[in-house]
């Protein structure tokens, strides 16, 4: 059986912490002028993968 390979796209997007998986925030790349400062400030906060999606993400980055 061949080696399990890390999904490189997922490896760049997710970081594994002690007990959660950190992810980037959506809606932050462009068209920021119409967004309020409060919205942009909240988007800077850390975001985590939901418990339901964690097994799928772990499968993609398991060898990483």
From Swiss-Prot:
Pfam families associated with the record: Ribosomal_L35p
SUPFAM superfamilies (UniProt xref): L35p-like
Gene Ontology CC terms, in alphabetical order: cytosolic large ribosomal subunit
Gene3D superfamilies tied to this protein: 4.10.410.60
Molecular function terms, GO-annotated: structural constituent of ribosome
Region Disordered: start-end pairs: 1-23
Keywords linked to the UniProt accession: Ribonucleoprotein, Ribosomal protein
Record InterPro entries: Ribosomal_bL35, Ribosomal_bL35-like, Ribosomal_bL35_CS, Ribosomal_bL35_sf
Biological processes annotated in GO: translation
Matching PANTHER family: 54S RIBOSOMAL PROTEIN BL35M (PTHR33343), LARGE RIBOSOMAL SUBUNIT PROTEIN BL35M (PTHR33343:SF1)
Family under the similarity heading: Belongs to the bacterial ribosomal protein bL35 family.
Name recorded for this polypeptide: Large ribosomal subunit protein bL35
Organism in which the protein naturally occurs: Nitratiruptor sp. (strain SB155-2)
